[in-house]
Amino acid sequence: MAGCKPTTGLNILLITEYARSVQAFAVESVENIMRLDWKQVHAAETAVSGRYITSIACLDEKTDTNELAMVLDVEQILYDITPANHDLHATNLQTTKFHIKPGAVAIVAEDSKVARSMLEKGLQAMEIPAQLHITGKDAWEKIGVLAAQAQAEGVPITDKIALVLTDLEMPEMDGFTLTRKIKTDPLLKDIPVVIHSSLSGNANEDHIRKVKADGYVAKFELNELSSVIEEVLDRSMKKIDGPLISRKQLA
């Protein structure tokens, strides 16, 4: 197996499903399986030099031990292995006109550096102005600032925020929590929210429906993302309520 030099003689493969594909990671051993709250995970771009680390997880709350684990940027790994399969093909974008008010921006929450870069290029190709954030918490704080500005000016929040585009798994605040906070706030609930995640499958889509997101696209396909954003913004402009918009509904 390329790049692997096992020292234990054990051939253990950790099978994952990510970004519409199945992968096998060679590991020497499995020490423990833990469930963590995303509040225990912190962004690490400025603290860790490795390009394959996206965040650091605190495995316990004991200050004397304070065990830490580095979280892999799987999207970066997949992009390096098969870049053609995990790129946003902006050159092949089907051009369209998006219903965005002048001055409004897209708020993007994405912890993976490579995914964030691809989203930035994709939104530029769509001519959608965007502000990018590493965590859901950062995005939520920016939404609060823009909401305060909208209130002070006496204008709808959609004059400031055209849509929110968020990943699901992020440090400090995940995409489910971010979406739920937006959709349960009377002042923010009209902001269209599109989930753009490497996690796929019916279970995740059910969770996305429960938090009342407006759209869902599995990474990475720019035309699908563009189509979902177009439909979500069109429905928002016409003030039409409807079911979750995903590539299944648009197919």
Regions found by a protein language model. Name each.
Residues 176-189:
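Short amphipathic alpha-helix used as the core "switch/output" element in two-component signaling
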Residues 29-63:
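Flexible, small-/acidic-enriched active-site or ligand-binding loops
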Residues 103-114, 119-123, 164:
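Conserved acidic segment of CheY-like receiver
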Residues 170:
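Receiver (REC) domain active-site loop signature in two-component systems and cognate sites
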Residues 147-165:
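Active-site beta3 strand of CheY-like receiver
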Residues 177, 199-219, 223:
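Alpha4 helix (beta4-alpha4-beta5 surface) of REC/receiver domains from two-component response regulators
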Residues 135-138, 174-177:
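Acidic catalytic/metal-coordinating carboxylates
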